[in-house]
UniProtKB/Swiss-Prot annotation:
Organism this protein belongs to: Prosthecochloris aestuarii (strain DSM 271 / SK 413)
Chain intervals for the UniProt region annotation (Disordered): 223-279
NCBIfam families in alphabetical order: rplB_bact (TIGR01171)
Top-level taxon of the source organism: Bacteria
Known function: One of the primary rRNA binding proteins. Required for association of the 30S and 50S subunits to form the 70S ribosome, for tRNA binding and peptide bond formation. It has been suggested to have peptidyltransferase activity; this is somewhat controversial. Makes several contacts with the 16S rRNA in the 70S ribosome.
Keyword annotations from UniProtKB, A to Z: Ribonucleoprotein, Ribosomal protein, RNA-binding, rRNA-binding
GO terms for MF: rRNA binding; structural constituent of ribosome; transferase activity
Disulfide topology: none
UniProt similarity note: Belongs to the universal ribosomal protein uL2 family.
Name of protein: Large ribosomal subunit protein uL2
One BP term from GO: cytoplasmic translation
Amino acid sequence: MAIRKLRPVTPASRYLSYPEFDEITKSEPEKSLLAPLKKSGGRNKAGRITSRHRGGGHKRFYRIIDFKRNKDNIPATVAAIEYDPNRSARIALLHYVDGEKRYILAPKGLKVGEQLLSGDKVEVKPGNTMPLKNIPLGTDIHNIEMKAGKGGQIVRSAGAYAVLAAKEGDYATLKLPSGEIRKVRIECRATIGGVGNADHENIVLGKAGRSRWLGVRPQTRGMAMNPVDHPMGGGEGKSKSGGGRKHPKSPWGQLAKGLKTRNKKKASSKLIVRGRKSK
């Protein structure tokens, strides 16, 4: 994927960049795989804000993605590579030989016309899915299950890939994109290759309005608020200390820099060999 930059004819276009979309082969989505997507504006069922800085944005339909890849030993042909407004990765439309159609995350290098397969023992090539126990060590993988049969939950964003580092007993050891080294049950499935659209991280929005199109609202600094609205608010001028401002805090009073918030008794902690911030 190439990134296009504009001539700086306006202040907004000076740094703005956007993808060329040259890998997209189909402009209209498959209607049978669409679902309505209602916006919440960051509110829960009581109408209270539970996720700040959300609201507005362009209307979208949800694309139903097959994260389970449980249609075993039935060949599928890649019919199209499509844009999905709900995620950073591109999606691929598969036509199975029995007539069913499904969307999957488009791996890096996937082309229209290729044949894909999922099952216990299939060819090791980008887009094929199989259990971790049958994947060779050192292979790049994505869309990894945390619980067998539940469907892929991690390593799904654009350009992401994990490396299968080891297998021992009932567990496989993975090196995740964050740097975390983690154990996963060996019967869990993963898809070969990395997720496509790796240049997504290099895109510059360029102007505030483009964030609004994505449904992201402006973010106000705590120091610019009043004391009633934020622990770091108030004071004369740009006060950096006093009145609870000595240590940066979240809007709810929790220390914002360096405080560990993960539950120490969490059961999955024993599966983390090395944390993402460990040296």
